[in-house]
């Protein structure tokens, strides 16, 4: 059970790291699937 929890925690950390790497990669609005690119970060477009 403890091994499973450690594995899940590691998987979550890897997913967050990959997500952050993708978020920081935007250079213009077309790089963000749904939102705007602001200073290299994809921000959600509200409204």
Swiss-Prot record:
Residue span(s) of the pro-peptide: 22-27
Primary location class: secreted
Disulphide-bonded residues: 26-37, 32-42
Gene Ontology cellular component annotations, sorted alphabetically: extracellular region
Residues where Phenylalanine amide is found: 46
Range of residues in the leader sequence: 1-21
Keywords assigned by UniProt, alphabetized: Amidation, Disulfide bond, Secreted, Signal
Compartments (UniProt record): Secreted
Tissues with expression: Expressed in salivary glands. Highly expressed in the head, body and tail with a 2-3-fold higher expression in the head.
Top-rank lineage group of the source organism: Eukaryota
Note: Does not show effect on voltage-gated calcium channels, potassium channels, and tetrodotoxin-sensitive sodium channels. Does not show activity on Nav1.7/SCN9A, and shows very weak activity on cation channel TRPA1.
Similarity comment: Belongs to the annelide toxin family.
Function: Leech salivary gland peptide with unknown function.
Protein name (Swiss-Prot/TrEMBL): Peptide HSTX-II
Taxonomy of the source species: Eukaryota, Metazoa, Spiralia, Lophotrochozoa, Annelida
